[in-house]
From Swiss-Prot:
The lineage of its organism: Bacteria, Pseudomonadati, Campylobacterota, Epsilonproteobacteria, Campylobacterales. SUPFAM superfamilies: Phosphoglycerate kinase. It comes from Wolinella succinogenes (strain ATCC 29543 / DSM 1740 / CCUG 13145 / JCM 31913 / LMG 7466 / NCTC 11488 / FDC 602W). Pathway: Carbohydrate degradation; glycolysis; pyruvate from D-glyceraldehyde 3-phosphate: step 2/5. One of its GO terms (biological process) is gluconeogenesis. It is found in: Cytoplasm. Monomer. ATP binds at K209, E331, G357, G358, D359, T360. It catalyses: (2R)-3-phosphoglycerate + ATP = (2R)-3-phospho-glyceroyl phosphate + ADP. GO terms for molecular function: ADP binding; ATP binding; phosphoglycerate kinase activity. Belongs to the phosphoglycerate kinase family. One of its GO terms (cellular component) is cytosol. This is Phosphoglycerate kinase.
Length: 401
């Protein structure tokens, strides 16, 4: 794991290349959440791309083409058009941005624009070849630039034309400032951390975190497991979890991880009590019970107050904290307390805290602690793969120092 992170840290960034007079193509991640009226509910990913775009403007780039996806469209769809983010992007950049609907139109537009112009290409996933890493599309994208910059950490685990294929044909290919910040922040937590190191892991499925748990035992000193995935671990201890979400085929795997952690001297903490209910959406009854005493026909939906107290003590004892996955169904107010209270505890420590993207970042934001964490990643799946010890495909094709 550490070797892979160190290798990714050696990637050249835009600070290592001459940009003046060059045509630049930046793969950004503008995949932001929007409501039914296309109002952006969280513009973090757009904000995080601004420093790289401004660096190119300030250093005299001839033209700047921005490429991103939005959602998972099946062909062209107005619902997933990047037109919806254009005004927010212009406001954050404090300059006008030219929107181009087709790849073919970019070259002709570029020929007529003044120096330092910024162009936003329509959703790259509208093009069939994007997710197939199509060679022709990759070459077409590369033809638009002298320098290819990947700044889309949230998509850096994908082998797509705009994140992977294009780099093979671009004359120069480097990391943007966000991509560099992401890898350096994870390196601080994983490759050269202050100890003790704690992993807080949650979410609904053990299956999505098995590789992470197996590989990170050599890096961390303690692990707190919450969320529905803790049910599978509790069942491996012989607890009857009633209607709680349990991945029965993975109960032996959970027991194996507990045994392996013990061998390596890594202390694992599981919930000692849970908030359980008869129904998550329309609960008639909500109870706090010991983890081993979930009532018949009930299911665990959050960690209980004794677990919050226990986990809080563990958190306060650590110098580095990595958090991936919520402690309960935090989107529902009745079952959000465990996640939110742990967020407050982490925020109150002096520890270096790294928050995995996706649900974890959303939960921390809802808890009002987003600005009190050392670093919050913009990538959900990408941060998980990084924690699993993988070298992300986007880094494989960028130049090294």
């Amino acid at each position: 794991m550490v070797a892979g992170i160190n290798l990714m840290q050696e990637t050249k960034s835009i600070r290592d290349v001459e940009i003046e007079g060059k045509r630049v193509l930046i793969r950004v991640d503008f995949n932001v959440p929007m409501d039914s009226d296309f109002n952006i509910s969280d513009d973090t990913r757009i904000r995080e791309a601004i420093p790289t775009i401004n660096h190119c403007i300030d250093n005299g780039a001839k033209s700047i083409v921005l490429v991103s996806h939005l959602g998972r469209p099946r062909g062209k769809s107005s619902e997933f058009s990047l037109k919806h983010i254009l005004k927010r992007l212009e406001r954050l950049l404090n300059r006008s941005v030219i929107f181009v609907e087709s790849l073919e139109g970019v070259s002709s537009v570029m020929a007529t624009l003044p120096q330092k112009s910024v162009i936003l290409l329509e959703n790259i996933r509208f093009l069939e070849g994007e997710e197939k890493n199509d060679e022709k599309l990759s070459k077409n994208l590369a033809s638009l630039c002298d320098i290819y910059i990947n700044d889309a950490f949230g998509a850096s685990h994908r082998k797509h034309a705009s994140t992977y294929g294009v780099a093979k044909f671009a004359p120069v290919k480097v990391a943007g400032l966000l991509l560099k910040k992401e890898i350096d922040s994870f390196a601080k937590a994983l490759a050269s951390p202050l100890k003790p190191v704690l992993l807080i892991v949650g979410g609904s499925k053990v299956s999505s975190k098995i590789t992470l748990l197996s590989n990170i035992l050599d890096v961390v000193d303690k692990i707190v497991i919450g969320g529905a995935m803790s049910n599978t671990f509790l069942k491996s201890l012989g607890y009857d979890m009633q209607r709680s979400l349990v991945e029965d085929p993975l109960v032996p795997e959970a027991a194996k991880i507990l045994g392996l952690a013990k061998q390596k001297g890594v202390k694992i903490y599981l919930p000692v009590d849970v908030v359980c209910t008869d129904d998550i959406k329309n609960p008639k009854e909500i109870k706090i019970t010991p983890a081993q005493d979930v009532p018949e026909n009930f299911l665990a939906a959050d960690i209980g107050p004794a677990s919050v107290k226990l986990f809080g003590e563990v958190i306060r004892d650590c110098e580095t904290i990595i958090w991936n996955g919520p402690m309960g169904v935090y989107e529902v107010q009745n079952f959000s307390r465990g996640t939110f209270q742990l967020a407050h505890v982490v925020a109150d420590t002096y520890a270096y805290s790294v928050i995995g993207g996706g649900d974890t970042a959303d939960a921390i934001d809802r808890a009002g602690e987003k600005d009190n964490m050392s670093f919050t990643s913009t990538g959900g799946g990408a941060s998980l793969e990084l924690l699993e010890g993988k070298i992300l495909p986007a880094f494989e094709v960028l130049e090294r120092k």
